[in-house]
Amino acid sequence: MATLKIAPTLLNSFDFYIGCPESWKVKAYEGLVSTIKRAPFKPTPEITKGLNFEDQVQKRVEGCLQFGWKNHELPGSTEFKIVVDRCMYGKFQVWGERTYDVPGYGKVKTAGKADVLFPKGSDHFQYGKIIDIKTTGNFKDERKYTESWQPLVYGMFWEIPYFQFLVAVWEDTGSTKIKSLKAINMKLDLETAEERIVNQITNFYTWLNLNGLWEDYFHTYCKNPR
């Protein structure tokens, strides 16, 4: 049975292409099409560094809970230890998904993994909380994060309106030393979330058809047989 699916990263790429300056259009289009066609992707050193940071946070949390480690007595920067404390007692790498009815196309599945999830009813967050850990060597402002589709899509997985980005800012792009930590707190409007997500998917599908990319999306991105 054919399946339609979409990740918030693809919606972000589409948003970026539509809204970017004309001088960036060619590069933005190429990046969007590469995602649709699942072009081979080699993680950049920055991405690898970020993944390693997330892994270190998870291992520190697990060590504290399983073996009684004292976070603030162990090596690491103050910023790193704050991230660990914020994630303590949360569940790491939790898979979530939700299906939407998109007029003219049928059911479309969204899916992804939360870096850290505090489910509803947890001892530490009664109404639940989702944390996403980010790293960057060049923090400009919060809009890169707050305007992303990730919080809204992920919030709908578990119907949790509280989302937090923890952004570790390196001293520079080549460094592994944290200069500062940004906590970006969001309260999501889940009442309008489904309508917004469905509208965005519909706009994207219209664009795919107008640009002759539906078959690539349907067969390559969604992995439906030809």
Name each model feature, range by range.
Residues 99, 136-138, 169-172:
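Short, solvent-exposed loop/turn segments at secondary-structure junctions
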Residues 107-111, 125-128, 176-183:
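Short, mixed charged/polar active-site loops
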Residues 147-158:
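An active-site-proximal "capping" alpha-helix that borders the catalytic cofactor pocket
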Residues 1-122:
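Metal-dependent nuclease catalytic cores that hydrolyze phosphodiester bonds in DNA/RNA
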